[in-house]
Amino acid sequence: MLRSSVLQGRHILSSSARPRPAPQWLARAGASSRLAGQRFFADAKSPTPVTPSSATPVPAETAAKSTAGPSATETPTPAPTRKTGRFRKFLIYLILTSGLAYGGGVFLALKSDNFHDFFTEYVPYGEESVLYFEERDFYRRFPNTLRNKNRLSPASRDEGSRVTIPSKSGLSSKEVEETGTDVSQPGPHMSAVTPAKADEATIKPAAAKPEEKTAAVKEAKKQAQEPEKPREEPKQEPKLPGSAPITTLEFANVSEGDEPIVQELVKTFNDIITVISADEDSAKYSKPVAKAKEELQKIGEQILSVRDEARRAAQEEIEKAHATFDESARELIRRFEEVRANDAAQYREEFEAERERLALAYQQKIQTELQRAQEIAEQRLQNELVEQAIELNRKYIHEVKDLVEREREGRLSKLSELTSSVSELETLVTGWREVIDTNLKTQQLQVAVDAVRSALERSTVPRPFVRELVAVKELAGDDPVVEAAIASINPAAYQRGIPSTSQIIERFRRVADEVRKASLLPEDAGIASHAASLVLSKVMFKKDAEAGSDDVESVLLRTENLLEQGNLDDAAREMNSLKGWAKILSKDWLADVRRVLEVKQALEVIETEARLQCLRVE
């Protein structure tokens, strides 16, 4: 008690003297609760009736004091009207409900494709919200995309530094010098001197594109104009008469000439040679051209070596991968063998346990059967003893009657004997009549069942067999088995009829064609998918039926084989295993086969019941 009081005092001292202002809605709630618990007095009292006994003379001082009392008391302030705030609550609930519904819609749109289409199309800002959460999910799964988003490749960064524009770019005028009759210049007269090289020089530039030729010519002109500066006039070198033109480079002479990069380099080099050959000072470029040829040869050799190294590295990687795959295959085979051995041991244990259980159950069943057989034998023995006692009693009575009759030698004894004989004969005739009636009814039932079956087999088109079925029901009487068999038949089967086996096979072939057309359709296929499946079904090859495969073509082939064998039950099971559009298209055919199977099964049950009744009579 002392500790609790001390703690309460410390808490009061530690708290601030100024009370903390409460929230507005809490203050209103507290004020309303305080006003509800506070008592108020009315300003004017209700008048009390004055009786003659209460009207007594009062002094003036007392009256003055009494009148001054009510005026001195303060009048209480009226209670403020309490605001309900219904609109505010409704608005808050509406905002919360809308937010929850919108959030639930976004969540369902992320999970379901159908609801995603509806939500993004009809709900305002639905597409932006779903896209925002999908991007968040994508960045959560692949965080490296944000890092590599603004990263550029080194090649793209270096492109700006590699591209340079020369100072004297563009075209400039130049006087054309007349060559005159210089035999050293290339022309038609050079074809007789070097026919093979001239052909190569004319064929190879023609293989290049016109744009490449134009670029090469411009580049050659710029290079030719650069040394011409006004500082000093270069000395004109004497022309070398009879200098041979520079020959172009063949693809076959370059290593790895079939590579696209090498071909482009050779084309560019040949264009440069063509431009240099067209120049008057082509002889002084022979050494750089020869050096460029050697560099091209080296480039081809380097490409060949790099490709060989890459091929060797790829071969080593392939060999390593083969070794890894072989090791994985051996490990998988080992695990498979272990699992198979474990499964075999487990199956063996389960088999032994099941065999012991079956043996125990069989022993118990044998003991039960033996006990029942013993009880039946004892009961039969007791019945035989009772019958023998009755027979002895009857013989005793008969002997007594014989003695009485012999003694009396009257007609009364003979009359009683005749009456008993007649009664026995009537009993015998009645029993045989019941046997004959039962046999006749059984035969009539069998004939009626055969009539229904023959009517179904002879009909080329589905024909109702209500009359035959009514005849079977009337002949069966109150047999519950026959009534249950007839009740199991679909009313549409005997009212409209069922197709024959040939009609079922013929209709199956038509249905199979439609199923093959729709075999490639998904469950939510549209018009384009239907058209594509129809076109592809025309070019599909038929294959043999496989026992373990569940594709549409194998199921159709197995069903057709079963129908040709007359096994409708297994054929219906095969067709029922289809899925998607194939099952939807074969639904009517399956319904017809089910009705046929139901009718056949009911007829077999009725026929079996008729045979059982015959055996019971016998």
Swiss-Prot record:
It holds the Pfam family Mitofilin. It comes from the Eukaryota. The keyword Ribonucleoprotein does not apply. This is MICOS complex subunit mic60. Residues 111-618 are mitochondrial intermembrane. It is a single-pass membrane protein. Keywords: Coiled coil, Membrane, Mitochondrion, Mitochondrion inner membrane, Transit peptide, Transmembrane, Transmembrane helix. Component of the mitochondrial contact site and cristae organizing system (MICOS) complex. Residues 44-81, 148-244 are annotated as: Disordered. Residues 209-238 have a biased composition (Basic and acidic residues). Belongs to the MICOS complex subunit Mic60 family. Residues 46-60, 67-81 have a biased composition (Low complexity). Residues 42-89 are mitochondrial matrix. Residues 1-41 form a transit peptide. Component of the MICOS complex, a large protein complex of the mitochondrial inner membrane that plays crucial roles in the maintenance of crista junctions, inner membrane architecture, and formation of contact sites to the outer membrane. Plays a role in keeping cristae membranes connected to the inner boundary membrane. Also promotes protein import via the mitochondrial intermembrane space assembly (MIA) pathway. One of its GO terms (biological process) is cristae formation. The chain crosses the membrane at residues 90-110. InterPro entries: MIC60 (IPR019133). One of its GO terms (cellular component) is MICOS complex.
